[in-house]
């Protein structure tokens, strides 16, 4: 089936999704399974860069991921040690042997969880972390300990997603577009990027920065206020804006924001460069 035909099939199924269940068989199930297989192998992705800049979202693939939940009942599955799981989505590496992992070309540390339909490119290092359905993690990237990559999130090449970082998903609450982390981005520990925010290439997000669609991103040098996009090669730290005065005239509570303090320079690169030895 061609991609165009598959997209049309998924769109039709979406319009009639109330009639789908775990008992559904035939072409409907085959179409959803094929979409998940293509996502899992990296042949398609929920969002992809456009030649003229920016990102194009393939909404039909998001629909396919959501439809798969309607088509599947939860079943028991092996967990860690004596702890079992009970879920609708199998794990990506279920049944993999040494040859299959060698073919994949990435490293998976014990405790890393990747659900089926997420794509992991060669050269990726997964510390004990979580990668959700439909996500795309490109080559040379490290997902560090306790980091989470949300549903359908797109992470570029040679990124470092530090410990405890959260990259938001699109399925709940339902978002129009996924979070996009472009190539060569460093995200500091315990930061959060959610609600379809795009972090453009080469940027450095400091520890403890929280950016959602409504977060003000302020360029300290120009005063420009941005929403939903961190410009390429920005260095971003947490900040706050003074709040409006309260009715009695006393200062109001300050509001969190993200501040672009400078553009990436050689000093910044020396502190955030990736270690090729860890990816060999």
UniProtKB/Swiss-Prot annotation:
E.C. number: 2.3.1.117
This protein's UniProt keywords: Acyltransferase, Amino-acid biosynthesis, Cytoplasm, Diaminopimelate biosynthesis, Lysine biosynthesis, Repeat, Transferase
One GO BP: lysine biosynthetic process via diaminopimelate
Binding site for substrate: 107, 144
Pathway stated in the Swiss-Prot or TrEMBL entry: Amino-acid biosynthesis; L-lysine biosynthesis via DAP pathway; LL-2,6-diaminopimelate from (S)-tetrahydrodipicolinate (succinylase route): step 1/3
Class of enzymatic activity (EC top level): transferase
Superkingdom of the source species: Bacteria
Catalytic activity: (S)-2,3,4,5-tetrahydrodipicolinate + succinyl-CoA + H2O = (S)-2-succinylamino-6-oxoheptanedioate + CoA
GO MF, one annotated term: nucleotidyltransferase activity
Major site of localization recorded for this protein: cytoplasm
InterPro entries: DapD_Trfase_Hexpep_rpt_fam, Hexapep, THP_succinylTrfase_dom1, THP_succinylTrfase_N_sf, Trimer_LpxA-like_sf
Cell compartment(s), UniProt: Cytoplasm
GO cellular component term of the entry, any: cytoplasm
Pfam families per record: Hexapep_2, THDPS_N_2
NCBIfam families hit by this protein: dapD, PRK11830.1
Subunit field text: Homotrimer.
Family, per entry: Belongs to the transferase hexapeptide repeat family.
Protein name: 2,3,4,5-tetrahydropyridine-2,6-dicarboxylate N-succinyltransferase
Encoding gene, per UniProt annotation: dapD
């Amino acid at each position: 089936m061609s991609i165009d035909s598959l997209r049309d099939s998924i769109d039709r199924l979406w319009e009639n999704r109330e009639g789908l269940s775990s008992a559904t068989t035939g072409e409907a199930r085959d179409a959803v399974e094929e979409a998940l297989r293509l996502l899992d192998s990296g042949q398609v992705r929920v969002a992809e860069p456009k030649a003229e800049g920016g990102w194009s979202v393939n909404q039909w693939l998001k629909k396919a991921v959501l439809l798969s939940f309607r088509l599947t009942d939860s079943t028991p599955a092996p967990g860690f040690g004596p702890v079992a799981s009970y879920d609708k989505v199998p794990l990506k590496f279920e049944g993999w042997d040494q040859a299959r992992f060698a073919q994949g070309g990435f490293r998976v540390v014990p405790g890393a969880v990747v659900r089926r339909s997420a794509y992991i490119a060669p050269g990726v290092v997964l510390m004990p972390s979580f990668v959700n359905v439909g996500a795309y993690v490109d080559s040379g990237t490290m997902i560090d300990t306790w980091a989470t990559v949300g549903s359908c999130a797109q992470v570029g090449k040679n990124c470092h997603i530090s410990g405890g970082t959260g990259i938001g998903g699109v399925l709940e609450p339902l978002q129009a577009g996924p979070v996009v982390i472009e190539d060569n981005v460093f995200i500091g520990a315990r930061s959060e990027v959610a609600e379809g925010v795009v972090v453009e290439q080469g940027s450095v997000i400091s520890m403890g920065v929280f950016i959602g669609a409504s977060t003000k991103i302020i360029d300290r040098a120009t005063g420009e206020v941005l929403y939903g996009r961190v410009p390429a090669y920005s260095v971003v730290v947490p900040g706050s804006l003074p709040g409006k005065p309260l009715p009695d005239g006393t200062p109001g509570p300050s509001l969190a924001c993200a501040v672009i303090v400078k553009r990436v320079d050689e000093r910044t690169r020396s502190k955030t460069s990736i270690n090729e030895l860890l990816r060999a």
